[in-house]
């Protein structure tokens, strides 16, 4: 079926292991309820009608994905990821087809809310460079002394935001910025940082702070609580 200007492809880099989870199983394959974290993350994307396809970049040696129902989903494409996140995203972009806009979403961020996703997708009507979901920093921030666990000073949190995902950009722009940044040896921690490196200024779309990334063991219980609460609210 031909794509339209409204169609969006989502890219989910899922080739990482996540050693901070202190488990032999990659964190995206840990279960919350009757689904893996990866399944929760992908289904949240597919719940929006504009997201017509999801490309998942997995490790070439991954044997777990084929055991999931996602492996046979008609809207899912699987590609081999790379050593770094940016390599996996580029592999996903190459498989995204001719869509104008792409989302990039963390495999281990299962608590995405549909209202946040809808507001982010609306950027395609008002922005040429896209933007990201983000949450204003509310905690007091400290900078440490170099090489020490000692406070150097308090950082002014005004204007500081936590970068979340999804992140949403024109496909060709993101591809070109990632390629240039990697070729020039830039440090790329998320997709927005590639655009920043190339002189662009993506928009900040305020999202819910409970859109957490499961990184440490204690995050798993918190994500389960948030997902259970959301399901309960939807059913009442």
Curated annotation (Swiss-Prot):
Annotated site (Transition state stabilizer): 20, 27
EC number: 2.7.7.60
Site (Positions MEP for the nucleophilic attack) location in chain: 157, 213
Presence of keyword Endoplasmic reticulum: no
GO biological process, one term: isopentenyl diphosphate biosynthetic process, methylerythritol 4-phosphate pathway
Record field: catalytic activity: 2-C-methyl-D-erythritol 4-phosphate + CTP + H(+) = 4-CDP-2-C-methyl-D-erythritol + diphosphate
Pfam families xref list: IspD
Enzyme class: transferase
InterPro entries documented for this protein: IspD (IPR001228), IspD/TarI (IPR034683), IspD/TarI_cytidylyltransf_bact (IPR050088), ISPD_synthase_CS (IPR018294), Nucleotide-diphossugar_trans (IPR029044)
Pathway: Isoprenoid biosynthesis; isopentenyl diphosphate biosynthesis via DXP pathway; isopentenyl diphosphate from 1-deoxy-D-xylulose 5-phosphate: step 2/6
GO molecular function: 2-C-methyl-D-erythritol 4-phosphate cytidylyltransferase activity
Keywords from the UniProt entry: Isoprene biosynthesis, Nucleotidyltransferase, Transferase
Database matches in CDD domains: CDP-ME_synthetase
Similarity-based family: Belongs to the IspD/TarI cytidylyltransferase family. IspD subfamily.
Quaternary structure note: Homodimer.
Name of protein: 2-C-methyl-D-erythritol 4-phosphate cytidylyltransferase
Upper classification of the organism: Bacteria, Pseudomonadati, Pseudomonadota, Gammaproteobacteria, Enterobacterales
Recorded name of the encoding gene: ispD
């Amino acid at each position: 079926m031909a794509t339209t200007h409204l169609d969006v492809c989502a890219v989910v880099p899922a080739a990482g292991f996540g050693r901070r989870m202190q488990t032999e199983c990659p964190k995206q394959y840990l279960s919350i309820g009757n689904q893996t974290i990866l399944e929760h993350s992908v289904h949240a994307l597919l719940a929006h009608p504009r997201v017509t396809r999801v490309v998942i970049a997995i490790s070439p040696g991954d044997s777990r994905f084929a055991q999931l129902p996602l492996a046979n989903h008609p809207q899912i494409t699987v590609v081999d990821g790379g050593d770094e996140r940016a390599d996996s995203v580029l592999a996903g972009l190459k498989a995204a087809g001719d869509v104008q806009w792409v989302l990039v979403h963390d495999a281990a961020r299962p608590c995405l809310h549909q209202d946040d996703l809808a507001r982010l997708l609306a950027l395609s009507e008002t922005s040429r460079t896209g933007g990201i979901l983000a949450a204003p920093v509310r905690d007091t921030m400290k900078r440490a002394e170099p090489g020490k666990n000692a406070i150097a000073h308090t950082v002014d949190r005004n204007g500081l935001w936590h970068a979340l995902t999804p992140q949403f950009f024109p496909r060709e722009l993101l591809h070109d910025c990632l390629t240039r940044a990697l070729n020039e040896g830039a440090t790329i921690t998320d997709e927005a940082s590639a655009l920043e490196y190339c002189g662009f200024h993506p928009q900040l779309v305020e999202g819910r702070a409970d859109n957490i990334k499961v990184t440490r063991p204690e995050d798993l219980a918190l994500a389960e609580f948030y997902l259970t609460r959301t399901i309960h609210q939807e059913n009442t």
